[in-house]
Design a protein with these regions (language model features):
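Short amphipathic alpha-helix that is part of the acyltransferase structural core
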Residues: 1-41
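Conserved beta-hairpin
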Residues: 44-64
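Conserved acyl-donor/pantetheine-binding loop and adjacent beta-alpha core of acyl/acetyltransferases
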Residues: 59-92, 100, 154-157
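Conserved acetyl-CoA-binding loop-helix of GNAT-fold acetyltransferases
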Residues: 101-115
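Conserved GNAT acetyl-CoA-binding A-motif
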Residues: 109, 116-131
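C-terminal "cap" of GNAT-fold acetyltransferases
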Residues: 124-126, 131-134, 149-177
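Conserved active-site tyrosine of GNAT-family acetyltransferases
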Residues: 130, 140-141
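Conserved acetyl-CoA-binding loop of GNAT-fold acetyltransferases
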Residues: 141-150
Length: 177
C-alpha cells in the first residue's frame, strides 16, 4: 500500500466524528460523544486527530497529569524532587479499523511525543503516562514504555488497565534519531 498523506491537528467543534469506527465501542463512544465536551466545555483534555484527506483515521486525547516520584520506575527516579511531578497523560488513542495495521498508531504516538517535549519546554514534563489496556501492553512496551506499580482493585468484569511510563529523556533520544 502506498504511503498515506496524513496530517495531525487539534479537534475542531465542527469536525464530523460520527463516521469514525475503531471497532472498540468504548473508544468510539468516547470520541463521538465526549472528546468535544472534554475539550471545548470542560477543558480537561485535548483531542488531536489524524487525517488523510478529510477523513478522520485516528485520534489521541491527552491531558496534563502528575505522578509521585515513588511511582516511577526505579531507573527514572534519579535526582528528582519528592513532590508530584508533571506528566502528559494519554487518555485515549484509536485508529479507524479500515486503517489499522499500517503503523498509524506509532505515528500518532510520535506526534504525542512532540507534544510532551513542547510541554516540557513550557511547563515541565518528566514523561508520558498511559493506562494500557491488556491488548495494548505489548504495543507500548515495544516503544519503550515501562510498567508502573499498580494498586490492586476491582473493576467488576472489566480487565484492569496497566499504567505505563515513558521518560522524557527516552522520548528526546527517540526523536533525535
Amino acid at each position: 500500500m502506498p504511503e498515506l498523506d496524513i496530517q495531525f491537528r487539534a479537534l475542531k467543534a465542527k469536525d464530523d466524528k460520527t463516521v469514525f469506527c475503531s471497532g472498540n465501542i468504548e473508544l468510539d463512544r468516547f470520541f463521538q460523544r465526549y472528546a468535544g465536551q472534554n475539550q471545548f466545555r470542560h477543558h480537561i483534555g485535548t483531542t488531536y486527530i489524524l487525517l488523510t484527506g478529510n477523513k478522520i483515521v485516528g485520534f489521541i486525547t491527552v491531558s496534563a497529569g502528575e505522578i509521585a516520584v515513588d511511582d516511577l520506575p526505579s531507573q527514572s527516579r534519579s535526582r528528582l524532587p519528592e513532590y508530584p511531578l508533571p506528566v502528559m497523560r494519554i487518555a485515549r488513542l484509536a485508529i479507524d479499523k479500515q486503517f489499522q495495521g499500517l503503523g498509524l498508531g506509532k505515528k500518532i504516538l510520535r506526534f504525542s511525543f512532540e507534544l510532551a517535549l513542547d510541554m516540557k519546554s513550557h511547563y515541565g514534563c518528566v514523561g508520558v503516562v498511559v493506562d494500557a489496556k491488556q491488548e495494548s501492553i505489548n504495543f507500548y512496551h515495544k516503544l519503550g514504555f515501562l510498567p508502573l506499580e499498580t494498586l490492586v482493585g476491582e473493576l467488576g468484569d472489566r480487565p484492569q488497565p496497566k499504567p505505563m511510563f515513558l521518560s522524557i529523556k527516552t522520548i528526546e533520544q527517540a526523536i533525535k534519531k
